[in-house]
Amino acid sequence: MFKEGIPFDASSFKGWQGIEHSDMILTPDLVRYFIDPFSADVSVVVFCDVYDVYKNQPYEKCPRSIAKKALQHLKDSGLGDVAYFGAENEFFIFDSIKIKDASNSQYYEVDSEEGEWNRDRSFENGVNFGHRPGKQGGYMPVPPTDTMMDIRTEIVKVLNQVGLETFVVHHEVAQAQGEVGVKFGDLVEAADNVQKLKYVVKMVAHLNGKTATFMPKPLYGDNGSGMHTHVSVWKNNENLFSGETYKGLSGFALHFLGGVLHHARGLAAFTNASTNSYKRLIPGYEAPSILTYSANNRSASVRIPYGISKNSARFEFRFPDSSSNPYLAFAAILMAGMDGVKNKIDPGEAMDINLFKLTLDEIREKGIKQMPHTLRRSLEEMLADKQYLKEGHVFSEEFIQAYQSLKFNAEVFPWESKPHPFEFITTYSC
């Protein structure tokens, strides 16, 4: 099995193969596996790549294979030996969720004991203890306001069991929201770790009678969940982002940043991959939409974290979220950064101000670009700016077309055509 791979039906995955050419092979990665901590019997979870039996090569629509090609392209270009990524994934843990999607009815309802909407509710034995973080009031409270500390502790223990080292875990700003960050790794390893993290968080919540989601914006009027992504590039065991320019960065780093900012509007098709993503990217909720950079400034879309050593020089890209496929998101970020280095793209001046306070007129006057406001727009921007993705045959034209078609048909068109409950408030009595 490990030598010959595992055959499967690729036509069962949307956007992949037609039924007439559906045979593909899963090739296990024998250095990337873990014992499933939730299985009743001993089970091993193995990360796999997809092999194309028709072209006798890694499948060009396999996200993990694309991530591997991006890392190899970095090496082949001579620009670096390895790109390190580290993700901070935010999530919500709710007590329950109800969803209805019918022709005559559209609604959802999530619930959490922490929710401010439950201030007047009687819980078990008629008791309501009253300790709640409130909207945007949940950053690092202690119990009893923080009702999820024990669940997060259990998450960390299980993550350690499956080989992930955590460096940050706490209640986040929103009600019922948490965050766990795991140690960085190379591009592919970091993407594997995101998948592993999401599995563990969802399963621990499930076994505690809760439901976890990495959806970017499940609550109106409260902060959303991002996937802040830390990046650095190394060569000959040296951090190429360390230098003598702004905040200890190198020219290489600033050009890398210039590439990401230059391509960010199309890059969002991979880093912010859902229609819901763009409800998070609005001012006032610590989710940056203005494409600029700054040191220690969480209103900028790119933050330069404080570091005491050259090895810690890195960027924190704050716009991505966990609706993205991490293999595609990380690969696209690397490709954009490499394009910036090759073409010496200037990122412009840093903006060390609270960008959330800028008016639209001020943003226009300063010539600052913003993130797209919809998934449709990000896909259109990606299609108009895709050549950098295709360098080194990392993202193929066939993959790009399949990806945009899937996103339009499965998400954009249905979202645009469905009546929304809020429209009945604004329009029903017209």
Residue ranges and their predicted role:
Residues E88-A102, H171-G185, M215-N237:
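Histidine-centered divalent-metal-coordination microenvironment in nucleic-acid enzymes
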Residues Y51-P58, P143-P144, F184-A190, N237-N239, ...:
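A generic structural motif
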Residues M1-H171, R364-C430:
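ATP/Mg2+-dependent ligation/transfer catalytic cores
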Residues R64, F85, M149, T153, ...:
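Conserved structured core elements
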Residues Q136-F167, V180-L187, K198-F214, H262:
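Accessory "access/gating" subregions that flank catalytic or transport cores
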Residues Y107-S112, G137-T145, K183-D192, E238-K247:
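Glycine-rich tight-turn/loop motif centered on a GG-T
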Residues S105-R121, N125-V127, M227-K235, L291-Y293, ...:
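Short beta-strand elements
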